[in-house]
């Protein structure tokens, strides 16, 4: 499925990464990501705020796990990665500063 007028072609079912680094540890997350890729999936969704709400987490755990997975697999050119800017208690709203911090 083509996204708008872009040259991005994604499968109809994306994989949400909100559990990676939280209820799914890195090993389990890698297994899920491998299975999704093997089944023909190519659209992975995440956000910088994923799992900040879990004890011991600060947000970004999902992005970190997905980044580690991408670095360890020859699949980067086959994946479309979608992310979002989140608000967290210490970073409310969508100010320029919050967006800049989320990108880092």
Where does each model-flagged region fall?
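N-terminal binding-site loop/beta-alpha segment at the start of enzyme catalytic domains
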Residues: 1-80
